[in-house]
Amino acid sequence: MRPYPIHCVSIVIPVYNEEDSLPELLRRTEAACKQLRHDYEIVLVDDGSRDASAQLLEEAASVVDSPFVAVILNRNYGQHAAIMAGFEQCKGDVVITLDADLQNPPEEIPRLVAEAEKGFDVVGTVRGNRQDSALRRYPSKLINLAVQRSTGVAMSDYGCMLRAYRRTIIDAMLACRERSTFIPILANSFARHTTEIPVAHAEREHGDSKYSPMRLINLMFDLITCMTTTPLRLLSIVGFAMAGLGVLFAAALIFMRLAFGAGWAGDGLFVLFAVLFVFTGGQFIGMGLLGEYLGRMYSDVRARPRFFIEKVLRGHPATPAPAITVDGLTSNSTSDQVLS
């Protein structure tokens, strides 16, 4: 692993109904970036907010020589789609994602940049003394464990979006066109060198969590279907096992019928019904998993855009990063649209 030269750092922050926390977020994020030895830009993506968040972002980006970039989506597409929109607009050699709720302090940004300079493709974070309810913490631990087993990447907190990505990883993710994306897992599928560092975690001061129970369930299905095809393989294995047990059970019923007569067969009627219900339940579970994959393929075949950007406002053009080749991976700058 070689040191990674950095010329520009981009901070990508998805925003959804966060007008109360935005002034402090902008102030603290800019103050943290001023500690860097590199050029920087702060890309804030409004994900169809219904409050004044979009107006606040436009005002911040309209100031002369402002480091802020406002990306306004025409409606709510979800956190990960909004981050991907920010990836398309950012120019940094290292890109850091950060939530707008200030539960992860922006003051951690210099630490992530320092780790990325060592040559890591992805720098993850682990929330210390997590300030969430038990109903959020324990399911998160189970999901993180399942992701580790499925991906083989030893990262322990996939739910924390405070992360740093090398430019080549960003370009690789942008080349993927699937509609449903979970960015930490997608990034790790392209990363060669990954690491994690502990970060602080604070209580949310303004507003409520944007993840309702139904959205958490949808996220769980996205995790299952985006990271592995193991459920499909497991479905086949379980199907063969159930078929084998069914054959053995039928053989046992025939033997008992021949050995003990018709009276015994009648006594086993309810057992047969119970087994039938178990098999039927297994079929429905399998069809449900298969339906998740078919729905994903249907969305990809439609080839709808992941998001639609209504406008992009920049205080000044970001310094374009030159092409860099490290460990055989080449990073190229993308084109930019500057609106005033």
Swiss-Prot record:
Cystine pairs: none
Residues that span the membrane, as ranges: 235-255, 269-289
Pfam families associated with the record: Glycos_transf_2
Cellular component terms (Gene Ontology): plasma membrane
Location in or out of the cell: Cell inner membrane
Keyword set includes Repressor: no
Biological processes per GO annotation: 4-amino-4-deoxy-alpha-L-arabinopyranosyl undecaprenyl phosphate biosynthetic process; lipid A biosynthetic process; lipopolysaccharide biosynthetic process; response to antibiotic
UniProt feature coiled coil, ranges: none
Database matches in PANTHER family: UNDECAPRENYL-PHOSPHATE 4-DEOXY-4-FORMAMIDO-L-ARABINOSE TRANSFERASE (PTHR48090:SF3), UNDECAPRENYL-PHOSPHATE 4-DEOXY-4-FORMAMIDO-L-ARABINOSE TRANSFERASE-RELATED (PTHR48090)
Function: Catalyzes the transfer of 4-deoxy-4-formamido-L-arabinose from UDP to undecaprenyl phosphate. The modified arabinose is attached to lipid A and is required for resistance to polymyxin and cationic antimicrobial peptides.
Record protein name field: Undecaprenyl-phosphate 4-deoxy-4-formamido-L-arabinose transferase
